[in-house]
Amino acid sequence: MDAAKIHAKIYAGRGKAALRLGLLYDVMRPVTASDPFSNKVTTLNAAFNNTDNKYLKANHPGEPLWYGDFDGRQTLAGDYLAGADSTYFIAAQQQLLPIICVECNRTVRMTRPVVPVPESESDNVSVLPYSGMCQSADESVDVLGSSPQGGLPAVGWPASVLFGKGKLRNATALKAGTPEQLGWQIMLPVSVPLVFQPGDVLVDDLGNQFSVSGAELSDTGWRLQAIEVHI
């Protein structure tokens, strides 16, 4: 028996375990930047444990990673699992190993300026407000999710938005006298169809705004270091 068949049998076994332990989740596979839940693939049973495989450890605050027990033959890294009370995205489906999932506690959307400020003018405080962010819909365009319009609510991508480690300085704020702030870590799936850049601003479903200080893409998805900003 080759490795691929063993891998498939492991996923089949996890699927059988989920039939006893798990709840129903819709598998959503993003195909557009504007709405990650427009493409439902299937519904399956899934159970999640705090990376111990024995279901003995409780999850603690600030820990978004879980192991998922479900039939991985029906899913891909980057898929969302949307349940009645919780949403996860699949961070990685590595050969013969547990399926790594990230619990989502917020949804986020992002706009970018229609006309970027020339680098030669980036130090001119009269060009944009201090934060460098757009103040109106006419100055920006949706690139991830969608802004509220026409009486319709905003649409965001489910993400993990938790306190990070250490303090950060807003890369788009005025350079002189800018205080450091407590950082945030935002995690999004590899299925996000864009590349994050320092200075990007994300807005969550509570209206909080986060300026990206650094972005890392790996086989487990996006990790963004960000600070909360106020304009």
Regions found by a protein language model. Give the residues of each.
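Short Lys/Arg-enriched alpha/beta "domain-start" segment
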Residues: 15-24, 30-36
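Short, intrinsically disordered N-terminal pre-domain segments
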Residues: 1-20, 230-231
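Short, conserved turn/kink motifs that form compact alpha/beta structural patches or helix kinks used as
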Residues: 30-231
